[in-house]
Amino acid sequence: MEGFSCSLQPPTASEREDCNRDEPPRKIITEKNTLRQTKLANGTSSMIVPKQRKLSANYEKEKELCVKYFEQWSECDQVEFVEHLISRMCHYQHGHINTYLKPMLQRDFITALPARGLDHIAENILSYLDAKSLCSAELVCKEWYRVTSDGMLWKKLIERMVRTDSLWRGLAERRGWGQYLFKNKPPDGKTPPNSFYRALYPKIIQDIETIESNWRCGRHSLQRIHCRSETSKGVYCLQYDDQKIVSGLRDNTIKIWDKNTLECKRVLMGHTGSVLCLQYDERVIITGSSDSTVRVWDVNTGEMLNTLIHHCEAVLHLRFNNGMMVTCSKDRSIAVWDMASATDITLRRVLVGHRAAVNVVDFDDKYIVSASGDRTIKVWNTSTCEFVRTLNGHKRGIACLQYRDRLVVSGSSDNTIRLWDIECGACLRVLEGHEELVRCIRFDNKRIVSGAYDGKIKVWDLVAALDPRAPAGTLCLRTLVEHSGRVFRLQFDEFQIVSSSHDDTILIWDFLNDPGLA
C-alpha cells in the first residue's frame, strides 16, 4: 500500500526514527512534520492529507517480495500480520487507511441478494420502508427499481396502511380500490402492475388531505332523512353503519333506514313510550324507553326477543359489550346486567349514589362511568361494581359523556364541555361555545363533535384541547348549522357525521364527497 514501507525485514534504525517521529506527544500539525492542513472557504479545516513523499530506492523491489510472502500465508496469519503492522503506524497513517477502506467495506446487499437467488429477502427488507424512503430506493439504481417493482412493494405499503389505519380502511371501501388488495382477484381477473399502486398512493394521500381540509373548513355534502312521525315529532337516538341507520323516535317506534337510498326498510313497534336510547351489534338491537322497559330485538328480522322490566322510571341510556350491559334511569339508579344471550339477560348489580336522574353511562373492562343531573360524574369498578371516585366541576346537570382509555368528555346544561383524566379525576380542559345545553358528544383520536339544544353541531380539535398551551379560541374548528331544532344525538367517523334532532330529521354530513369539488 502506498505511503508506508511493507518490508518483512525488521525496520532499520533510520526507518524507526522516521516512523516514531510523530509518536507521543504526537503533534499532528507542526512546522516540520509531513502533514498539511488546508482551509475551506468558510474557515473550517478540511481533512488532513499527507504530503507527497519520495519512495525509497528499494521500495518497489521489496513491495513485490512482501506481497509474495503475504499471499502464501493463511487467512489468520494475514489478519494477524496486518493488525501488527497497523499497530506500528502513526496516527495520520491510520486516517489514510481508514479513508481507503471505507468504500471497500460498503456493500450493496439489495443488489447482491437477487444475484444469489434471494430476491424475496431483498423485497422483504425494502417492504419496511415508508413512502418517501421507497421513492428514494427506486432511484438508487436499476436493480433496486426492479426489486421494488417485482416485489409489488407499493401494493404492500398500501395494504399495511389499510390494516393499521381506519381512515385508509374506510377509503379503500368507499373509493373501491380495496378490491385490488390482499391477494384478492379483481373483477376482471387481472392483477394490476406495481405502477398501478405507485400511481394510486398519491391519489390516496390527496384524498386524506382533502378530508382533513373539509373538516376544518366545514365543506361537506348533506343528505336529509325526513322521519315523518305521525304523532309526536323528534328523533332521540341513532346508530349507523355502512348499510343502515337505526333510529329511536319520540313516537314510540324504532325505524331502520337504508343508508344508501335513505328509504325506511322496517319499523319496530312494541314500546309504549318514546325510544330514548339504543345500541345494536350484528345480532340484536337493544332499546330503552320512557315506558321504563328495555327491549331486545333481532337485528335481521325485527322480531322482539326479550323485555327487561326493572327500572321504575324512564330508561335514559344504555351500553352493552362482551356479555355485559349497563342501563341508567330517571329513577337515579344504574343497573348492571349479564348477557348470556338475547333471551338470557340477568341483573347482576344495582348501583346507587346519584341524587338525580342518571342521564348517561359508558364502560370498559376497567370502569363504569355515569353522569347525572346532580352535576357529578361517578366512576365505578367494572369487575366489583364498587364506587371509585366522583368528578366534580360542572355547574349544572350533565346530559352526555363518552369514556375511552383515560379520557372522559362530558357535556352539560351549563353549556360547556369538560375533558377529564379518569385516573386522577382532574379536569383537563373546559370548552365553551354552545349557547344552550350540550345534549350529545362523541370523540375519536382527532376530534370532538358536540350537539346542543341551540341546534348547532360543533367540531373541536381534540389534540389541541389536550395541550394546555393551546389558546381557547383555536379549539373550535367549525360550527355546523342545518337543524332547525334541538340536536339530540350524533355519531361520526373519519368521513361523516350523522345527527338527529327534535326537528324530526336525520342529517348525513359527508366530508369526503364535497360537492364543491365535483
Swiss-Prot record:
Residues 119-157 form the F-box domain. Residues 14-24 have a biased composition (Basic and acidic residues). It comes from the Eukaryota. SMART domains: Beta-TrCP_D (SM01028), FBOX (SM00256), WD40 (SM00320). InterPro entries: Beta-TrCP_D, F-box-like_dom_sf, F-box_dom, G-protein_beta_WD-40_rep, WD-F-box_domain-protein, WD40/YVTN_repeat-like_dom_sf, WD40_repeat_CS, WD40_repeat_dom_sf. Residues 1-24 are annotated as: Disordered. The keyword Iron does not apply. Pfam families: Beta-TrCP_D (PF12125), F-box-like (PF12937), WD40 (PF00400). Residues 1-12 have a biased composition (Polar residues). Keywords: Repeat, Ubl conjugation pathway, WD repeat, Wnt signaling pathway. WD repeats lie at residues 230-258, 270-298, 310-338, 353-381, 393-421, 433-461, 482-510. GO terms for molecular function: beta-catenin binding; phosphoprotein binding; protein dimerization activity. One of its GO terms (biological process) is Wnt signaling pathway. Substrate recognition component of a SCF (SKP1-CUL1-F-box protein) E3 ubiquitin-protein ligase complex which mediates the ubiquitination and subsequent proteasomal degradation of target proteins. Probably recognizes and binds to phosphorylated target proteins. May participate in Wnt signaling. Part of a SCF (SKP1-cullin-F-box) ubiquitin-protein ligase complex. Interacts with fbxo5. This is Beta-TrCP.
